[in-house]
Amino acid sequence: KPNSTTTFTMEWDAVIPHQIRRAGRNNREGIDMTMTQWYPKIAEYDYDGWATFDYIGREFHAPFSDFDVSIKIDKDYVIGAGGTLENPLEVQGYDAKANIKSDNKNKATWRWTAKNILDFAWAADRDYTVEEFTILDGPKVYYVYQKSEKTKLWEESKPYVTKFFQLMNAAFGQYVYPSYSFIQGGDGGMEYGMCTMILGEGRSLEGLVGLMVHEGGHSYNQQILAYNESVRPWMDEGFTSYYDDYVMHQLFPPKEPVANPFVGSIKSYVSFTNTGKEDPAVG
């Protein structure tokens, strides 16, 4: 009933598969676990009815929720997640003064909270490094990744990510959450509540920043505005692509100045429509 409350208590078992489309263990860059779409989820009910479509490797939609998550794992792991770590002094990676607490099985418990987000995702690896920086009038940003020669561009990307949030906040509205985490994991790039999972090796600086800009841009649509991508996929990817062009044009100005940074996307769209494969945007 409207304005009523129901409490569900659930127990479930699951096997973490080898890395599949979005989640799993031992991805191609050696990340131990990428834990996305990992728990039974309550379906969202909105103007389109119940959102009961599968989440497997595809878009997802869910109710805004508050999360209080405890994860017990071997104490030598470092976890990256979307949310606020409530006990950084009891686990490794987030505070140099940490006194890691573990039980008699050498397991530590991590406690994360997050308010009013669509989904809680996390990843764990024994070789993660955690770096953080705070953006003026913006979120605290966390980088959680395997620091090596293959990921050296992460350090160089920080001023670009800072500028990304500043440009987005000025042009499209304030990012409303206290933090955002870029986490090395998964199989490409996928956004979740207050974080994204991305592959972190190789690429050029512009390629890495472009991936971060795209996935971070989703936070303004798929997460804050909560477009249902299964019903209107063009709204999330379309607006996020618009953000991409707007931001990247300023972060990496073309050698030959162009009056309209969206010309390339417009030409691609026209080319696609000429194939006759275009579906109606609304229908």
Predicted regions and their residues:
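Zinc-dependent metallopeptidase catalytic helix centered on the HExxH motif
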Residues: 197-274
